[in-house]
């Protein structure tokens, strides 16, 4: 066919030619359909707009004409004068009526509350309707109140009231402990003022080191002199700081001359220095021995906690801290007092032991089981169990060996024996059958005499004092690798003197993992202890646990004295503390002495600043105890919290190394202790030990890596020393809002949940008084109380301070010690703030406060009115809703509460309870769930939630974006997978109703839909619920297009912010934030995993272009779908405090396999490729695709960071085949998510990776895992022991039922309570068990029952010891307490009064009791010492003893009758098979 004919035919309209192909048909069809629709819509729109404008114009013209006519009429009536205008009468009536009703508001409220006056109320309603009164029905909003100024600012007042010289003096000598005012004034008499000009030396090398220098004005520089003659600046001492060495202080007091060997000090400018000679302390110490001992103890604690902590944990120095004296071969290692025959016999015995065939390995007991003070009745089981963990290193149990090898008891309760240190089986024989005849041929008396004389000289005692020390010295023979004490053991602390052989001192690696620390093979060798040397003095003086593990390197003989014996010797000879301290100081290396001049121990009160912004950074700080807050001040003056630091954190290290000025101000949140490491000391150590540089590089790398993962894209804008706010607290104060709050059961429940994470301690005022004495809260005992509390905090991962219901000294102490304050209230009661709560806020202005609202488990409704609670308490930073079991709200006496929870603590806690969620939050182990956006694919979230629930993973926090915001909000609101599934299915069905969506269509200027019907579906799902009222903490993320950033919503209207997070661009308009008017879009545009609940859910679903942006009702900002910024906000969840995060991503994936089309691109070529079926297709994004990819740029980058993070478990179900709007496939998509999630978590469980989600664990377990009571490891005040001050009340089983008291075994995990098989049960007085009666007599009854058992124990005969287990104490040792006739009069009178009351009570109630009633099972308690009294009563001891004996006889007769009744009843119970264990005593068993 001719081409011209074809073209002519085409022009004439004949399309049956070459151009009549597929593409022309497609184009014509599309044009026709779209033209019709758009034409119709445009026509309808034009008509509507014209009609609207016409009527609006017509109405305005009518209004203008009417106004003109009215004005003209009034003008004519008043003669043309406008001043004659008056209000109409009806307007006046409306005005005065409304005014009257405002005045009568209170009266009307009373009428409504009284229920009377129906006619009056009817009149009021009629008047309100006539007067057109309208109530504002605005939702309750969260008051955005800035924290008080004290929260972010330091305290500056208070220092001007003290003269500068006295203030600096007080601050400088505080390192020696607490001094009373008379002692301080005596020290001030010896001070001297030194005037120094610039360049003058304060001291030089070879000058005596015998003074404390305090800079009053000016500046002093301390230098260190190297061997080559060069000098290096060690630190700069400014006004108020001091130059001293505590190690030289001990040298001076010990009588040793001390000189400056490598340190000099020079004045940099004109300075005034206060000089305090160290000899001034000697005068004070002679008059007050207790002050001397306390100062030595403080110095040793500073040495261990400051010097060793800084140099070992942060600089990686271990062996460099101690001198390792090497012995010359052939020298005589044994003291010259040992005769020659003894040496030869000892060497023969050693060779015999070395050549003896190896026996079975000696197992050692674990640090949890082994104690010297409380022997285990079955040591072999625990030893075998520990041997599997700690390898083959044998361990010697000195106590058990002592019990098996010796039958004589010395004066101190210790056994004098020199038998071989080999394990014994039954019958006292060794496993190889050779017995204990290894050194029987050695003269025991000479060896013992040599040991006594050696230890006497080491302790600085004279020959006349031999009789004092001789009863306590013990000698042992050790085989190689025998362990004397393990690191962290506090019970087996002794003073060891090496007679022959060598001991090796080890320490665990600070960087080792948890498993590596438990393996003794990974311990680092510190130094050797050779013959003639002593070890163990540091732990003896500090009273803390041993910092080292000591093992025998070879066959050795040691002489040792136990801790209790040392303290008895110390009472008679207090100055032995100087010799013990001097022995510790002699062992230290010169590096430690140089560091002692530079390192400072700083005490900061709450509100004081460590350093300020823009100051020079010349030092770094180590937080020893307390809490610090870092605050940055912006150029406009606004302050913002950058981070918080807790115990063990390093503050200011980055700024010091980079030599930049301080970027933030760091202040103390509560009373804190810090170690100051100057830059000069850091440089000196760095030059001498290059390994320090490697250590710091590793430390800083981990810090920056964590900061990058935490802050993500905002890392560049954060300060250099930024540390995100951590939610891991070490001390928690519990404050009841009102008296009816069950604070004691609440503390028990929280303690029960915390025990599953690690060792926890619960402290009350009663516990502290019984442990430290009734006068412990006085000012004179400040040091003892502070040191004891600090030691308890070091032992436990968290300490609970239960406050009193009044502003007592104990409550004030709790506020000073707390890292966070939990304000506990009843959620269903009034939200009003009481006077006590306001006083609490004044006491701890800088401490973070969190509100805990309790609800009974029987409640069916979700929490409500939370906003009222929060608005009334602007100081609260976070709130928790806790659902409580029934036993918490049951009214019981303190005795019954303690008895109830003694059984509860034996069970495992419910890890899914709200108490467990709160426990994980406090310890920094919260588990977060992040749900990403993806439209209809979000139905997979429901299946994943079910799989998570079946895997046993608790959910502590939930965050979501877009559809994930909707599903997450449903879970936080219901917490029931069935209800959540039902509501999600109903919402998905509504989204499939196309006729509702057609009615929601609008002119597409901002979006295709108006969003009205979409809002209604979300509002119907949630109702008017606020985010604050959800059971689980929840947040959603939206895109704020007004401020061009993402916004995190943790409070406000739920449905609105969910709607905002689902506002996808182009489909719905952005949501306008009512707070600030900002426009919010879907949060997935910036981050796709993260008032009234529905509003923010709606805001999070505002898809741009589909739904309009949602306007925030708070500020007016426009909110869109959060997927534009962050579609999986796991980083936001991590910043909010979640430690372990599960992130579920259901978003669509972009195609990255695109065609490379070269340097230029022709649209015609793409059109040809697309419409030509005979060519290969190309993958080039079109314009809408490019716009979409640009919108999701930040989201994709954020998602990659989440995938590579170590805190997040990223999960993506296989739902790519489902479209974004396929809401009709809800059940199918849900099943896909469930099957995938179930298989995924099953594989994680098999691989061992599920434990961090569904099993509680302790990242840093304590050195000892079994703390049965506070007595096992407690603060030891040497001054109290030496000076025989009033002794403390030991916590034992006797005190467990006193008010607000703990149980024996209550301090550790609940499983340790299984060891306490015997508890006392005492019947109540009276016959009624009504809770309305006063039950304060329970504690008195327990005391009476205890005295009855005491009287019985004193009259009984001790049974024969158990031969099979020689270590088991006899009954004479296990009595409750002894009442010797030489007892002090006051104690006897107290017991006598109790016995008289018990005797009278029994005589009165004997004829009333029914003998057929079942009696309670009774048990004995563990042995416990009775506290001594310090005063004498005027009563005669003889009369008291006679009367006491008489009452004992009467009591014994009563007991014989009671025992016979009890035996008969037990026989009857055995016949019926109803005998129960003491642990299973129920509440009904307490009936009398």
From Swiss-Prot:
SUPFAM superfamilies: cAMP-binding domain-like (SSF51206), FabD/lysophospholipase-like (SSF52151). A nucleoside 3',5'-cyclic phosphate 2 binds at residues 458-587. A motif (DGA/G) lies at residues 1082-1084. SMART domains: cNMP. The chain crosses the membrane at residues 35-55. It catalyses: a 1-acyl-sn-glycero-3-phosphocholine + H2O = sn-glycerol 3-phosphocholine + a fatty acid + H(+). The modification Phosphoserine is found at residue 1176. Its EC number is 3.1.1.5. Gene3D superfamilies: Cytosolic phospholipase A2 catalytic domain, Jelly Rolls. Keywords: Developmental protein, Endoplasmic reticulum, Hydrolase, Lipid degradation, Lipid metabolism, Membrane, Neurogenesis, Phosphoprotein, Transmembrane, Transmembrane helix. Residues 1399-1410 have a biased composition (Basic residues). Pfam families: cNMP_binding, NTE_Ploop, Patatin. A nucleoside 3',5'-cyclic phosphate 3 binds at residues 576-703. Residues 1-34 are lumenal. Residues 415-424 have a biased composition (Polar residues). GO terms for molecular function: lysophospholipase activity; protein kinase A catalytic subunit binding. Residues 1456-1470 have a biased composition (Acidic residues). Phospholipase B that deacylates intracellular phosphatidylcholine (PtdCho), generating glycerophosphocholine (GroPtdCho). This deacylation occurs at both sn-2 and sn-1 positions of PtdCho. Its specific chemical modification by certain organophosphorus (OP) compounds leads to distal axonopathy. Plays a role in the signaling mechanism between neurons and glia that regulates glia wrapping during development of the adult brain. Essential for membrane lipid homeostasis and cell survival in both neurons and glia of the adult brain. Belongs to the NTE family. PANTHER family: NEUROPATHY TARGET ESTERASE SWS (PTHR14226:SF29), NEUROPATHY TARGET ESTERASE/SWISS CHEESE D.MELANOGASTER (PTHR14226). This is Neuropathy target esterase sws. The gene is sws.
